[in-house]
UniProtKB/Swiss-Prot annotation:
Species assigned in the record: Albidiferax ferrireducens (strain ATCC BAA-621 / DSM 15236 / T118) (Rhodoferax ferrireducens)
Annotated EC: 3.5.2.9
GO BP field: carbohydrate metabolic process
Molecular functions per Gene Ontology: 5-oxoprolinase (ATP-hydrolyzing) activity; ATP binding
InterPro entries the UniProt entry points to: Glyco_hydro/deAcase_b/a-brl, LamB/YcsF/PxpA-like
Catalytic activity: 5-oxo-L-proline + ATP + 2 H2O = L-glutamate + ADP + phosphate + H(+)
Protein name: 5-oxoprolinase subunit A
Superkingdom of source: Bacteria
Cell cycle recorded as keyword: no
Protein family according to the UniProt entry: Belongs to the LamB/PxpA family.
Keywords: ATP-binding, Hydrolase, Nucleotide-binding
Claim: Hydrolase is one of the keywords in the record: yes
Upper classification of the organism: Bacteria, Pseudomonadati, Pseudomonadota, Betaproteobacteria, Burkholderiales
Length: 255
């Protein structure tokens, strides 16, 4: 049995530091690297890409709405032509930096509000799918497990990977509890690790109301901006490994 463990990295901006990329890259198997629209600057992103290369971690483009002030977590009604161009631009920028770092971009995982919106909004989902296909149809799309987006992308010929979140609470419907609500973000590393082991072993996760939700996922995310991110990721990896689960990416790392 195997499982991918991913994290959102490269999100520091100038003098403003976000997360511990160096530590996380020693734990995760895939890195969702910021592309400059919600966070990240070229020099910092390049450093993260080089560290990913050195650790054999697979790289993905963490594309987002153009929203540095809101960290990409504000909903935006972006026109299709703009959204398609924005996603193409971000993937292209990361591809250039990745090539300079001696690695390559293997997948796309949208960030924040864009991620949540395209999980159910057909128009914006189609825009993101179109952008990926126009840049490189070989790129995998990482999306919320159980969301319609997975089927929409597959219908357009993209490979998809269903994702679950280690440090987020779920609703009984299998969606993420809004960050505005109490208890939306989890912090207890041991509890989170046991939740993820149950997810991998039994295909279920406990929702915020105590009910069990069926989730089929091939990748688990630990948010890099969570203050407990390193401890959570390490505990999840250790617990899964102890149970015989191999932590490896759904893609092959660049040579």
């Amino acid at each position: 049995m195997k499982m991918d463990l991913n994290s959102d990295l490269g999100e520091s901006l100038g003098a403003w530091r976000m997360g511990d990329d160096a530590a996380m890259l020693g734990i995760v198997s895939s890195a969702n690297v910021a592309c400059g629209f919600h966070a990240g600057d070229p020099a910092g992103v390049l450093r993260t890409l080089r560290r990913a290369r050195d650790n054999g971690v697979v790289v993905g483009a963490h594309v987002a709405y153009r929203d540095l002030i809101g960290f990409g977590r504000r909903n935006m009604d972006v026109e299709s032509a703009d959204l398609i161009a924005d996603v193409i631009y971000q993937i292209g920028a990361l591809k250039g930096l990745a090539a300079a770092a001696g690695t390559s971009v293997r997948y796309v995982k949208p960030h924040g509000a864009l991620y949540n919106t395209i999980a159910h909004d057909a128009r914006q989902a189609h825009d993101v799918i179109t952008a990926i296909r126009e840049v490189d149809p070989r790129l995998t799309l990482v999306a919320l497990a159980g969301s319609p987006l997975l089927g929409w992308a597959q219908d357009q010929g993209l490979r998809v990977v269903a994702e679950a979140f280690a440090d987020r609470a779920y609703t009984p419907a299998g969606t993420l509890v809004s960050r505005r609500e109490k208890g939306a973000v989890l912090h207890d590393a041991k509890l989170i690790a046991e939740r993820m082991l149950r997810l991998v072993s039994d295909g279920v996760i406990e929702a915020i109301d105590g009910s069990l939700v069926a989730i089929a996922a091939d990748s688990i995310c630990v948010h890099g901006d969570n203050p407990d991110a390193v401890a959570v990721a390490a505990q999840v990896r250790t617990r899964l490994t102890q149970a015989g689960v191999s932590i490896q990416s759904f893609e092959v790392a660049a040579p």
